[in-house]
Swiss-Prot record:
Its cofactor is Mg(2+). This is ATP-dependent 6-phosphofructokinase. It comes from Listeria welshimeri serovar 6b (strain ATCC 35897 / DSM 20650 / CCUG 15529 / CIP 8149 / NCTC 11857 / SLCC 5334 / V8). It catalyses: beta-D-fructose 6-phosphate + ATP = beta-D-fructose 1,6-bisphosphate + ADP + H(+). Belongs to the phosphofructokinase type A (PFKA) family. ATP-dependent PFK group I subfamily. Prokaryotic clade 'B1' sub-subfamily. It is an enzyme of class 2 (transferase).
Length: 319
């Protein structure tokens, strides 16, 4: 192993730059050459590859987004796309690859592994929906972004004695909604993994009113329904004319938290070590504060599950 490359793919997540920095500096420390691939798998197929030095990743640790850029390239799921990618890797004499991203990125990494190219996956997505790890890079930052907004919205909800609905990201996973709702004391948390009944939500709000509560916050993951649709349905149950805030892509941006920076640094360094050990086809993660690695194929077979105990706790504490 003399030369490795790194790419970021799919939706950006705060901490991707920190992970890239760790990969580059750890690899150079170990005597390897490092190349950056712009625009994910699209850039790989097009040969948009550049050499990275120690200085290339300076002033990156605190920056959100990804300086390697990102793009979605569904064509990489085809044999033609994968063979073009491997052709470019061989052309640039690259011996191993690190892929930072979510579920779709892992599918690309697995495809390269099956074709005999050593590839390591690093979980980078704000949704925290990757198996094999307790946390993904970017989740903690997104969580704190949502919590900051929730706290501010509660101020105005209190002032005007209103119900507010906050729509957060999470098409298939409700981790952002759950964790932010618990941390922010939301009166109701609506996630894709748990069915909900509007009668139960209204009953919870009514009980709050009966004991003097004059405002409420409901956090809704976008994968369940839009915040506006939820407000429309809620309005059919009486005088709950809620205001809606859609946080959108602000959740993806911002300077990564200390937790995400440290996590990204640890995972990036371990990815390089695995390539040096000739152990491709793995994805790194963190379990109980220990860095672990798992087979990418096995991770893709597993479905991310919501922390049921945490969900139940949030329900109890929001009474």
């Amino acid at each position: 192993m003399k030369r490795i490359a790194i790419l970021t793919s799919g939706g950006d997540a705060p901490g991707m730059n920190a992970a890239t920095r760790a990969v580059v500096r750890k690899a150079i420390y170990e005597g390897l050459e490092v190349y950056g691939i712009n625009y994910g798998f699209l850039g790989l197929v097009n040969g948009d590859i550049r050499k990275l030095e120690l200085g290339s990743v300076g002033d990156l640790l605190h920056r959100g987004g990804t300086f390697l850029y990102s793009a979605r390239y569904p064509e990489f799921a085809t044999e033609e796309g994968q063979l073009k990618g491997i052709e470019q890797l061989k052309k640039h004499q690259i011996d191993g690859l690190v892929v930072i991203g979510g579920d779709g990125s892992y599918h690309g990494a697995e495809a390269l592994t099956k074709r005999g190219f050593p590839t390591i996956g690093i979980p980078g997505t704000i949704d925290n929906d990757i198996s094999g790890t307790d946390f993904t890079i970017g989740f903690d930052t997104a969580l704190n972004t949502v919590l900051d907004a929730l706290d501010k919205i509660r101020d105005t909800a209190t002032s005007h004695e209103r119900t507010f609905i906050i729509e957060v990201m999470g098409r298939d996973a409700g981790d952002i909604a759950l964790w932010s709702g618990l941390a922010g004391g939301a009166e109701a948390i609506i996630v894709p993994e748990e069915s909900f009944n509007m009668d139960d939500v209204v009953d919870r709000l009514n009980k709050g009113r009966e004991r003097g509560k004059k405002h409420s916050i409901i956090v809704v993951a976008e994968g369940v329904m839009s915040g506006n649709e939820f407000a429309k349905q809620l309005a059919e149950y009486g005088d709950y004319h809620a205001r809606v805030t859609v946080l959108g892509h602000v959740q993806r941006g911002g300077s990564p938290t200390a937790f995400d920076r440290v996590l990204a640094s640890r995972l990036g360094a371990r990815a390089v070590e695995l390539l040096l050990e000739n152990r491709g086809g793995l994805a790194v993660g963190i379990r109980e504060n220990r860095i672990v690695e798992n087979n990418i194929g096995e991770i893709l077979k597993e479905k991310h599950t919501l922390d049921q105990k945490l969900f139940d706790l949030a329900s109890i504490l929001s009474i």
